[in-house]
Amino acid sequence: YTDIDKFSVGDFGPNSDYVQNDVDNPNRQIKEDDVFGYDYDLNVNKANLFYQHQFSKGIFHLFAGANIEGTTMERYGHMRNGRAMEFSKGSSGTAKFLGGGAKLGIALTFNANNTLTLGAGYENRAPIAYNSFIAPRMRNDFVQGLENENIFSAEASYRLNVGPVTAKVTGYYTILNDLVEQNAFYNDLQSQFTYLTMTGVNKVHYGVEAAVVYNVTSALSFNAVASVGNAEYTDNVKG
């Protein structure tokens, strides 16, 4: 096996630098356990400071939390790819992100058998490292205009205990804004494997989940679960 991009050979010829996955070692013959095609590291460092507080009075149980998170990311390529000879080997440089979030919830325990829980949260977080590069297997280029993603979420659940039966129903609604997503496909026009990166992706996820547990004995129980949900894009993305 020769370490070249077979998709590009027909258009550029087997001796072109363009088809080489590792220009510094052209037409290298691959043996068992060799690294070929691509070789890179994604270095991600995170630091997180988190605080949570709980308070109870009567039937009310309150909880609140907040966090601050710092993230750095870097791609370090170990091969000089023929499709990006100047931008594939070595360090990409470092991208830095500062984010955080908060959550708030309340549980109302009416009695030993009935509990209602409400919660909401917001998170501002760094994008996924793999999606932050234009073509992570080949290039060190960051996606232009990278920014933090924003996640809003809310949920409500009701728990019921009746004898040996415990039932819980949960509804959730999540808004995801400013996401970065990536798809890969073969591009016939350019005769090569291509990455399509989309920024400013906005989505919404919502649904209902239910579970029932019937405790026959202390060692035997039956469980039933069901869920219905939907996930959809809410507007046009940038690509």
Q: Regions from the language model: what does each represent?
A:
Residues Y1, A64-G70, L118-Y122, V169-Y173, ...:
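Transmembrane beta-barrel strands of outer-membrane/channel proteins
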Residues Y1-K6, G163-V169:
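Internal hydrophobic scaffold segments of catalytic domains
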Residues Y1-N111, A126, N131-F133, K238:
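Signature of Gram-negative outer-membrane beta-barrel scaffolds
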Residues N43-A47, K96-G100, N150-A154, N161-G163, ...:
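Residues that define the transmembrane beta-barrel architecture of outer-membrane proteins
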Residues L49-F55, I68, L104-L108, A156-L160, ...:
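Residues on the lipid-exposed face of transmembrane beta-strands in outer-membrane beta-barrel proteins
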Residues I59-L62, N113-L116, P164-A167, A219-F222:
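Repeated loop/turn-to-beta-strand initiation elements of outer-membrane beta-barrel proteins
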Residues Y173-I175, F193-G239:
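Gram-negative outer-membrane beta-barrel transporters
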